[in-house]
């Protein structure tokens, strides 16, 4: 049996004065999956997340949880439906280099890893895929 849809956002539109933050965005997350919303600053990631968690109301579109349409008027509504969000704060974690960020989630990484080897591997991958990445840049 296939995975069931846990979250489905269809045709989500959210506008702010002078800005269309989300323009008919669709997102479907299956039960048991983990997703990451990636994009440049201003791409609408936080706005979409804020709609899902009840901080904002969408101007158009629908949100479904487990196949049932929901309308959140507040974060409390979303929490009651099992949806919550831990907000990122820019000072929660110190800045790391590109190389340190790449290995951050590795189970065998530690403070004692070979920083030069990690930076060299990141540079190698950057070169292979034509990316202009400086492994020592702090981000």
Regions inferred by a protein language model and the residue ranges of each:
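Glycine-rich phosphate-binding loops of nucleotide-dependent enzymes
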Residues: 1-139
